[in-house]
């Protein structure tokens, strides 16, 4: 049986060259399944707003949403290390709010750590939260909460100036005390440079194979989100047609008087 994961495991894994496997989860049953498979880290992402709630982006997600879904994940008692996203406006306005909301995700939600988007601009915020003994994961590159400033979901760090800015962001996140950093939507060569430069693990999503670990959205790898599939996603299953078939069969059996049978009732 897998032992409870801690931040010490991820430091060791980077040092030993063992890749870190991360998936998102937002509920009890999915968490139980992936934890039984040996997933290293679970991210309760604000991506829940897109793949579960149907928003166009993550901006509408609230602290209440994140606490609710983090609690659902933690009820599965995962051995994986659970990180919860701080949603938009929960940490950007002032340090007091950032500390309070990070604390709520740990105290009320049950998360072991929080994730914050940004680099140099959130260095002070990361330090303020880690000073409360709350572990922090950074997130640089394509940061979904900044989509309007970026002009949409576009690859970041392509030019030399942008690449150097992202390197500065990565170093700032490490300097501030984060124990890991997500690299999203950046060139593979830049991700390799950052990974080699940092002493903390890098978790890639659309950043190539040279990161210390990888994260994907569970709905994407299961083929549950058909309207949009990013280039960096690999679908390990196509569950949407299977779910559709099951629903169609149920409807047909109810309409045809086939279900329920006598064995499905009580005497």
Swiss-Prot record:
Keywords: Cytoplasm, Magnesium, Metal-binding, Pantothenate biosynthesis, Transferase. Its EC number is 2.1.2.11. It catalyses: 3-methyl-2-oxobutanoate + (6R)-5,10-methylene-5,6,7,8-tetrahydrofolate + H2O = 2-dehydropantoate + (6S)-5,6,7,8-tetrahydrofolate. Its cofactor is Mg(2+). Homodecamer; pentamer of dimers. Belongs to the PanB family. This is 3-methyl-2-oxobutanoate hydroxymethyltransferase. The lineage of its organism: Bacteria, Pseudomonadati, Thermodesulfobacteriota, Desulfuromonadia, Geobacterales.
């Amino acid at each position: 049986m897998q032992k409870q994961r801690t931040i010490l495991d991820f430091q060791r894994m980077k040092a030993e060259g063992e890749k870190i496997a991360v998936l998102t989860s937002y509920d009890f049953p999915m968490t139980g399944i992936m934890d039984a498979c040996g997933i290293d880290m679970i991210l309760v992402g604000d991506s829940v707003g897109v793949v579960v709630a149907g928003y166009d982006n993550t901006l509408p997600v609230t602290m209440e949403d994140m606490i609710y879904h983090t609690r659902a994940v933690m009820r599965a008692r995962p051995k994986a290390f659970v990180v919860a996203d701080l949603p938009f406006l929960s940490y950007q306005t002032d340090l007091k709010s950032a500390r309070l909301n990070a604390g709520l995700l740990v105290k009320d939600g049950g998360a072991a750590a929080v994730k914050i988007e940004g680099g140099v601009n959130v260095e002070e915020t990361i330090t303020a939260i880690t000073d409360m003994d709350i572990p922090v994961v950074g997130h640089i590159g394509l940061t979904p909460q900044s989509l309007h400033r970026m002009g949409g979901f576009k690859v970041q760090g392509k030019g030399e100036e942008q690449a150097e800015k992202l390197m500065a962001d990565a170093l700032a996140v490490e300097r501030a005390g984060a124990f890991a950093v997500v690299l999203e939507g950046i060139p593979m060569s830049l991700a390799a440079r950052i990974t080699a430069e940092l002493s903390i693990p890098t978790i890639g999503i659309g950043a190539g194979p040279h990161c210390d670990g990888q994260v994907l959205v569970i709905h994407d790898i299961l083929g549950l989100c058909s309207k949009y599939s990013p280039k960096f996603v690999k679908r390990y299953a196509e569950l949407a047609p299977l779910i559709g078939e099951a629903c169609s069969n149920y409807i047909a059996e109810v309409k045809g008087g086939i279900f329920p049978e006598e064995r499905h009732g009580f005497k």
